[in-house]
Amino acid sequence: MALIELNNINFQYDDIPSLVDISLSIEKGESVGLEGDNGSGKSTLIKLLNGLIFASSGTYFFEGKEISKKTMKDELFEKQFHSKIGYVFQNSETQLFCGSVKEEIAFGPRQMGLAEDEIEIRCSDVMKLLGLTAIAERAPYHLSGGEKRKTALACVISMNPDVLIIDEPMNGLDKKSRVVLLDFLKAWKSARKTLIIATHEQSLLNELVDRIVTITEEHRIG
C-alpha cells in the first residue's frame, strides 16, 4: 500500500480548473519533486496533500485512510493526520505568530501534549541543527528572510513528522542558509523519511529527489 494515493483528483477555484485528473502514488521513504510553471497547480496540490483544501472530485488516501472534508471533521483524526505531515509554506512568514523563535518551535509539540522536558529537548536539538540557537529569544518580525525560513522548518521538524513537504525550499535564503537547509534535506532523505518538494530549481531536484512529477500548463501530470 502506498503512503499517499491520489486518484483522479480535480480541483477548481471559482470554477477555474487548478488540478485536472491527478493520479499519483508516493511510497513511504520516497523523495518526490514537483515541477511546473507558475500557475500550473503545484502549490494547490501541496495544499491538498496537507489537508488544507479538498478535491472537487476524486479521492485522496493517506496510510490507507481517506482524507476528505468529511473525515477531517473528526478532531482526533485531523490531529493525528497533521502530526504526520509537516508543511513549510512558500511564504514562511505566514507560519510565524509567537513571541520568539523558541516559542514558535515549542508551539507544535505543546499542542501534541508532550511533556515540557521533551519539548525543551526537541527545541534545543532543532535549533542546533538549523543554526538558530543564538536567536532563540528573538521575535520573528526581527528575523531575516532566511532566519524566518529556518524557523518555520524548525517548527515543522520539532513535531517529528513522517512526511516533510516544502514549497520552494530555497525561497529567500542566503548562501549560508541554503547550505544548511540542503544538508538537512539530504540527511532527511538519507534517513528514508518521505520528502516532497515543489521548486523551479532543477539542480535541487536532481540532487534531492528519487523522481520528478511535472504539472503541465493544463494542470495535469505530464
Q: At which residue positions do the language-model features occur?
A:
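The feature captures the beta-strand-to-loop junction immediately N-terminal to the Walker
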Residues: 35-37
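Helix-to-loop junction immediately C-terminal to a conserved catalytic motif
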Residues: 50
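Conserved ABC ATPase "signature" region
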Residues: 117-135
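Conserved ABC ATPase signature
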Residues: 139-143, 147
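Catalytic Walker B motif of ABC-type/P-loop ATPase nucleotide-binding domains
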Residues: 164-167
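H-loop/switch region of ABC-family ATPase nucleotide-binding domains
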Residues: 199-200
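Conserved ABC transporter NBD signature motif
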Residues: 58-70, 81
